[in-house]
Each structure stands twice: as C-alpha cells, then as structure tokens.
C-alpha cells in the first residue's frame, strides 16, 4: 500500500495561531536522564552508582544522571552524565528506556522534575571515579543492594 502525504501549508491564519501557542505560558519544569549500568565484575552482577556530592540528596547513593541540555536528547544526556559523573567513557550503543518518573513534588527543587530512566548491560569497563556533582562512583553488587544499600532516586 502506497500512502501519499501532502505537506501542510502554513497560511497566515495558521501562522497566527502558532504564534499564539508560542506565547502561551506553561509551568516551568526540568527533564533529567538517569542511567542504570549493569556489568559482571569479580564474577558478580553489579550496578554502577554515584554518591551525590551536592544538594539535594548530598551523600546519598543514586544512579548517574542529570538535566538535559537544550540541544540533546535524553539518550545523549544519559551518556554525557555517565561520563561526567563516573569517568566511564564507554560507547553504550543501545540504551533501553526503563521508565519515566513524573510524579509532582518528587524532587525538592523549585520546579517540577521529570526523569527518563535508562538501563544498559555492558562488559566490565574497569574502575570508575566521581566527577562534577558526584563525590564518588562505585560498582555495587546487586545482591548487596537488596539487603544493605538503599539507592535514593526520589519518590516516584
């Protein structure tokens, strides 16, 4: 089946309506991208975490992540934040979207924050270190997460 699509021509009335939409105010909010990176290290299934070095959530363990820049996709932001916060310069290739978290007031900052979470399984990529707003980066065995460590990612 062949489908022909005719492009929309913007008439003056359509353009005027679009200008009106651009002027409409919307509540401010931020979009972040987080990434859960899993690997096998020392014969154990492990997750890459950071310790927050700044408020909010100072000292808490979290997934690497941060706010999107205006010129990047959520996937690009996840890759950039991974490098900035863990010094892990890996070509992830395919990121799988895990979930989007958008509950109002899930983040204590002034504006609403919506988070797109991704995950990836990679080969053991070696040691990591904290950078930018991460005090440190560490590999944590997943079986220890279930028992001893609580990862803070905000109420969802």
Predicted segments, located by residue:
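Intrinsically disordered, low-complexity regions
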Residues: 5, 15-18, 119, 125
């Amino acid at each position: 089946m062949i489908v022909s699509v005719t492009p929309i021509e913007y008439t003056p009335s359509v353009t005027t309506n679009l200008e009106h939409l651009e002027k409409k105010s919307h509540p401010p909010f931020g979009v972040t991208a987080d990434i859960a990176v899993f690997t096998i290290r020392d014969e154990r299934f492990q997750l890459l975490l950071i310790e927050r070095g700044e408020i909010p959530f100072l000292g808490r363990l979290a997934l690497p992540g941060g706010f999107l820049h205006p010129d990047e996709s959520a996937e690009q932001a996840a890759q950039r934040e991974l490098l900035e916060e863990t010094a892990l310069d890996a070509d992830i290739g395919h990121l799988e979207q895990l979930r989007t978290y958008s509950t109002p007031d899930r983040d204590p900052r002034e504006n609403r924050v919506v988070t797109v979470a991704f995950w990836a399984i990679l080969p053991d990529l070696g040691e990591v270190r904290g950078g930018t707003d991460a005090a440190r980066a560490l590999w944590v065995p997943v079986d220890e997460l279930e028992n001893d460590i609580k990862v803070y990612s905000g109420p969802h």
